[in-house]
């Protein structure tokens, strides 16, 4: 499969939509406790990929906003199932800030600064100069997931063109406290 995805045009020839049903992976979001050694205490919720044999791999991105972005889509897919769709960062500003606070335990004003950097690039005077780092965070997500499971197996685990995770909703397990989020 890895060879196929490297061939020019192969992604147009093969129907990758069925990969979500065939994926052996699960996404799990757990509340941090001191038994979880892969994450430090900064993380109140931890994302793991679990393979078909039950081995868990911690999912850590280079940027914390990418971690929250990915978690938004995990929660959305787990709670809305097949109705999950693209999530507007601007429409979900308050939900994103609340999620950031929940995941990292920081005050509202700090989480809001993270959101502003995410959605906009600001000058020293606080004025919007251009769009934010959304594309950088998507690339961070793609690279991290691919490094854990490989290119072909990463397809249903990435945020694709449709704007949602293609992994089947029953393969996503989240802590019940995260079901309070209502993304749109």
Residue positions per predicted region:
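Residue-identity detector for threonine
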Residues: 5, 11, 35, 79, ...
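DNA-binding patch around the recognition helix
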Residues: 14-42, 80, 133-184
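Short, Lys/Arg-enriched segments at the junction into DNA-binding effector domains
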Residues: 6-84
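Short, Lys/Arg-enriched charge-dense amphipathic segments
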Residues: 107-120, 127, 172-184
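Short interface patches used for recognition in eukaryotic signaling and trafficking proteins
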Residues: 52-55, 120-128
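Short amphipathic alpha-helical recognition elements used for nucleic-acid or partner binding
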Residues: 56-119, 141
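DNA-recognition element of transcription regulators
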Residues: 62-70, 125-148
